[in-house]
A protein has these predicted regions:
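N-terminal signal-anchor transmembrane helix
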Residues: 1-40, 82, 117, 121-130, ...
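Alpha-helical transmembrane segments of integral membrane proteins
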Residues: 2-9, 76-84, 129, 133, ...
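N-terminal TM1-TM2 helical hairpin plus the immediately adjacent luminal interfacial "cap"
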Residues: 8-83, 90, 94-103, 157-163
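Hydrophobic cores of alpha-helical transmembrane segments in multi-pass inner/ER membrane proteins
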Residues: 9-10, 58-63, 110-118, 167-182
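Alpha-helical transmembrane segments of multipass membrane proteins
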Residues: 15, 66-67, 89-94, 116, ...
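Divalent metal-coordination and catalytic microenvironments
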Residues: 43, 54, 107, 141, ...
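Membrane-proximal helix-loop-helix units in multi-pass membrane proteins
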Residues: 90-118, 122
Length: 194
């Protein structure tokens, strides 16, 4: 069993940034600032949160998924988080020219949950079935969000912020790609199993 270092570092960073207006201003995804060369915002915007509710939703889900991933020693978790953050920022910048600001960890959270579920599908017993059900839920949630063009949580009236369903899809695709690459590597080199 491993201590969830990366999970706690990412959560602590999000809390620190939330409690510092200066850091929020410096790190939020801001299209105009990115266009003028502040490229770090493509990644760091994922750590910025705009309300207590926004932060709480993301932290609870990330703490649970990340802790389980790290305790179960599923490999490449830091790579997953960084890859998802980078791809979310770059893709949103490329395909959402009308989006001037973006903040939140939900796309990375979705990547973590998807990654956890995919690993769980390789195991036996009840855990496998629980992961299959969670993965089906993630896919259904993203489908609903994309059809309604809003977050599932917003459709039940509980959000104070504007969600970006595309970030959840990007997170899921990132998790699937990294999982398949790690699976392929473990098949080529059995000593480096997942």
């Amino acid at each position: 069993m491993r201590f969830p270092v990366w999970t706690l570092v990412i959560c602590a960073s999000a809390v620190l940034i939330f409690n510092s207006p200066e850091l929020r201003t410096l790190l939020i995804y801001d299209r105009a600032a990115i266009t003028h060369g502040e490229l770090w915002r493509l990644v760091t915007g994922n750590l910025v949160h705009l309300s207590n509710t926004h932060l709480a939703y993301d932290l609870v889900a990330f703490l649970i998924a990340g802790t389980i991933i790290e305790i179960r020693c599923y490999r490449f978790f830091p790579t997953l988080c960084l890859s998802a953050a980078i791809l979310i920022g770059i893709i949103l910048y490329g395909v959402e020219p009308g989006m001037y600001f973006y903040a939140g960890l939900s796309g990375v959270v979705t990547a973590a949950i998807t990654y956890l579920c995919l690993h769980g599908l390789t195991e036996k017993g009840m855990w496998r079935w629980l992961c299959a059900a969670m993965l089906a839920g993630v896919i259904a949630k993203i489908g609903i969000e994309l059809m309604l063009d809003q977050s599932f949580l917003l459709s039940v009236g509980t959000e104070e912020f504007v969600p970006v369903p595309l970030s959840h899809l990007i997170g899921t695709v990132t998790a699937i790609l990294l999982f398949l690459m790690s699976l392929s590597a473990s098949l080529e080199h059995p000593k480096n199993a997942l």
